[in-house]
Amino acid sequence: MIKNDTIAAIATPPGEGSIAIVRISGPEAIQITDKIFSGSVPSFASHTAHLGIVNHKDRQIDQVLLLIMRAPRSFTGEDVIELQCHGGYFSCSQILEALVSEGARPALPGEFSQRAFLNGKIDLIQAEAIQNIIAADNLDAFFIAQNHFQGHFSKKIQLISSLIVESLAFIEVLADFPEEEQPDMDVPKQRLNEAMLIIEDLISSFDEGQRLAQGTSIVLAGHPNVGKSSLLNALTNKNRAIVTDIPGTTRDILEENWTLQGKRIRLIDSAGQRETDNLVEQEGIERAISAMEQSEGILWVMDATQPPPSLPEILFQKPSLLLWNKSDLASPPQLDTSLPQLAISAKTGEGIFELKQFIQKWMQQQQLGKNAKVFLVSSRHHTILQQMRSYLLSAKEGLLAQLPPELIALELRQALQATGNLSGSEVNETILGEIFSRFCIGK
């Protein structure tokens, strides 16, 4: 499966910018680049930079900075050269065209990362993390992906694998030498229990990992016509929600992604809570209640010009903040409650800065102790770990029931293969192709 040709691609996004990078990797990377670069590329030491001119067909294309990384001390494990040229479309595209005309092949999406995987520089978990780092649209998603790329998830899988191998060795002694004195079965039982604890911890992190990667959900709730939609617009600086003086205007869930200090938040505007005979509005209210139940926090909006309303019980079951909107029209009353309260005006902007500070502190408190934890965010990883758990549970039950060792060994081998499906050592070409095809060209 390892390819021996030399590939090239533009590694930076298209469009205007100060610099662009053209990357080339493979056994002929140095020789091909030498044909278009003004210096003697074969004489350059690894991990050095050289200023020069790219020429092709008697035409000077651009002045570039050449970085050379000789195999195996490179990202792909092959000879790699990066040419840093002026930004924009034409310089990098002309350099790529020159490299291809001299023998390089245009790289496929993710092919540089795929070569790094095939050459043992990274495992499949780390390769997938590269794409997640690139695609991250908030800090939580970025740091989860960085955690995977740094190998923390892979180390857990390696530990699980070693525990399974140790258990399997004991079981295979039973199968191969049934007449001999039997080893102590407490050892494989203990090793399987240790592996199961790690697997359960990883599986249980999936929902939280998804939430962190996709963003914290905060619901704007309250009675009709208190300014929930106006607040959504004020926080996001968009006219996203329809604002009228007619109660019950919002009848469905309206969600808007919002980034606050690098943290992604899913702000959810919901239907006003009241008694109504309108079936459509009733459905909206039911959806609002469901959204509050599933959210990580609630902003309960109230009208400062109206008497204090009763508070629903759900506000005391999860992080909640009481907001007295329209404080530009009246001084808000103070409710006798343990919940924090804040006066704001979605119309004038009063209190919005303080509200953002409160939400930021809120999220920092939720984040405590999570930075070093490995979170699952991939459905592929989650599914394989569930399969692994099933195999190990069957093996444990087989040990307790004293089933034939061959049957127990079969379950352990399947669990061991599942660890290979995660790391990539047991993955076929079709799956690898599907995974790396999601990458951008040049990575």
Swiss-Prot record:
PROSITE patterns in the cross-refs: G_TRME
Pfam family, one: MnmE_helical
Binding site for K(+): N225, T244, I246, T249
GO CC terms of this entry: cytosol
Cofactor note: Binds 1 potassium ion per subunit.
Domain of life: Bacteria
Residue ranges annotated for the TrmE-type G domain, each copy included: 215-364
Cofactor(s) named in the record: K(+)
Known EC number: 3.6.-.-
InterPro entries recorded: G_TrmE (IPR031168), GTP-bd (IPR006073), GTP-bd_TrmE_N (IPR018948), GTPase_MnmE (IPR004520), MnmE_dom2 (IPR027368), MnmE_helical (IPR025867), P-loop_NTPase (IPR027417), Small_GTP-bd (IPR005225)
Catalytic EC class: hydrolase
Keyword terms of this UniProt record: Cytoplasm, GTP-binding, Hydrolase, Magnesium, Metal-binding, Nucleotide-binding, Potassium, tRNA processing
Residues noted as binding Mg(2+) in the record, renumbered to the chain: S229, T250
Role of this protein: Exhibits a very high intrinsic GTPase hydrolysis rate. Involved in the addition of a carboxymethylaminomethyl (cmnm) group at the wobble position (U34) of certain tRNAs, forming tRNA-cmnm(5)s(2)U34.
Subunit text: Homodimer. Heterotetramer of two MnmE and two MnmG subunits.
PANTHER family: TRNA MODIFICATION GTPASE GTPBP3 (PTHR42714), TRNA MODIFICATION GTPASE GTPBP3, MITOCHONDRIAL (PTHR42714:SF2)
Family statement: Belongs to the TRAFAC class TrmE-Era-EngA-EngB-Septin-like GTPase superfamily. TrmE GTPase family.
Protein name, entry field: tRNA modification GTPase MnmE
Organism: Chlamydia caviae (strain ATCC VR-813 / DSM 19441 / 03DC25 / GPIC)
Gene name of the record: mnmE
